[in-house]
A protein has these predicted regions:
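Short glycine-/polar-rich loops that comprise or flank the Walker A/P-loop
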Residues: 33-35, 148-149, 176-179, 275-278
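Generic beta-sheet signal
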Residues: 119-123, 149-151, 253-256, 278-280
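Polybasic (Lys/Arg-rich)
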Residues: 59-92, 97
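Signature of the SF2 helicase/ATPase Hel1-core->accessory helical subdomain module
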Residues: 135, 141, 162, 166, ...
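Walker A/P-loop
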Residues: 116-138
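A substrate-engagement module of RecA-like helicase motors
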Residues: 87-90, 94, 147-254, 259-262, ...
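Mg2+/Mn2+-dependent nuclease catalytic core
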Residues: 1-63, 135
Length: 355
């Protein structure tokens, strides 16, 4: 699908490589000595904007296909080496303090047992009793024993992460091999503050063509701090947030906000929409009901809709179906949200059936 203002002069490299991969598969499955591949760009209305045919031998297809797979093969091997080193270090891991505080050992045992048995655990402990260490330590031991694939430490606020970071820092003093990633809010990580689209941001343009080397550099490093992730992203001109999203697939521990695991709109789909063995350690879980209500609630602002309708009207005209539909929605919102007391805000217990 081509959405540019001018016809393409050459195929985008990723699109050409996709065609080459198809060509290789045809050569292998049908025993072809050569194959003709073609990248075609069309508009939404079906108008052809560019055609780029190419004839390749089976050997040329095979060589290019292998060149695409090679970085992923290196990544798999690196992850396996790291996993062996990580598990060995976790097997030797000791509790980071000489003695347990009251209740810490019991909590650690319950956390480990819950992970092993794939059960939920709701634990209450007073502030200052070392909950972060009492949950992370057994979770890491379970990770090293293959009882879980990843550990996600979820917090309600950024300030709450420090306890988990301090606990991990103390554990790292034991020569721990661990890829621990912190995910910050997307708007805080954005260095350009432009529209997140390849047409407007150089970091978004071709991001996934450049992130392979950056991921390899991170896998060779022990420092997965937010500062180092941003530094590597800058080095390769990557979007720091999308780079962190790629790293979370191979990270051992991820520290992030509730949203990235539980909010249907912004959760990490490549992790939580897939069948993965993930353990969630949810700090201050009593905040969850309010946060979940916010995640699942929606609001409609007729003033905002009017501004958007004005933009649509200038671009497409007042007779456009979208403009008319927005007018209908604005009228419906005004009629629904005007309480008897005359205030400009209202709350609906549920949406009307005909809304």
């Amino acid at each position: 699908l081509w959405q540019g203002e001018h016809p393409p002069e050459a195929p985008i490299s990723a699109h050409r490589m996709q065609a080459v991969c198809y060509g290789h598969m045809l050569c292998v499955t049908r025993g072809l000595p050569a194959v003709d591949v073609r990248v075609v760009y069309v508009t939404r209305r079906g108008k052809v904007q560019g055609e780029f045919p190419e004839r390749l031998t089976a050997e040329e297809c095979r060589a290019e296909f292998q060149s695409v797979l090679l970085p992923y093969l290196r990544r798999i091997r690196a992850v396996r080496r790291h996993t062996r080193a990580r598990n060995a270090s976790l097997a030797a891991l000791k509790f980071p303090y000489a003695n347990y505080r009251p209740g810490q050992r019991e909590m650690a045992v319950q956390v480990y047992t819950a992970i092993k048995r794939k059960k939920r655990l709701f634990a209450c402990m007073p502030t200052g009793t070392g909950k972060s260490s009492a949950t992370l330590f057994p979770a890491l031991k379970a990770l090293g024993e293959g009882l879980t694939g990843q550990v996600y430490y979820l917090t309600a606020r950024t300030t709450q992460r420090q306890g988990a970071l301090d606990a991990l820092a103390r554990l790292h003093q034991q020569t721990l091999h661990l890829w621990a990633l912190v995910i910050d809010a997307k708007d805080k990580q954005c260095p350009t503050h432009t529209l997140c689209h390849p047409d407007y941001c150089e970091r978004a343009k071709g991001h996934f063509l450049r992130d392979t080397e950056a991921i390899e550099e991170m896998m060779a490093a022990d420092d997965w701090s937010a500062e180092n992730v941003r530094a590597v992203a800058d080095k390769y001109c990557l979007c720091p947030f999308e780079f962190a999203m790629s790293l979370c697939e191979i990270a051992d521990v991820v520290i992030c906000d509730y949203n990235y695991a539980l909010d249907p709109a912004v959760h990490i789909r490549r992790i939580f929409d897939a069948t993965r063995d993930v353990t969630l350690l949810i700090d201050e879980a009593h905040h969850l009901p309010e946060r979940i209500r916010d995640m699942l609630s929606g609001s409609v602002d007729s003033a905002g809709l009017r501004k958007l309708r004005t933009v649509v009207g200038k671009a497409a005209g007042k007779k456009h179906p979208l403009y008319k539909a927005m007018t209908d929605v604005i009228r419906a919102v005004d009629s629904l949200l005007l309480p008897e007391d005359g205030s400009m805000e209202g709350t609906l217990p549920k949406l009307p059936d005909d809304f």
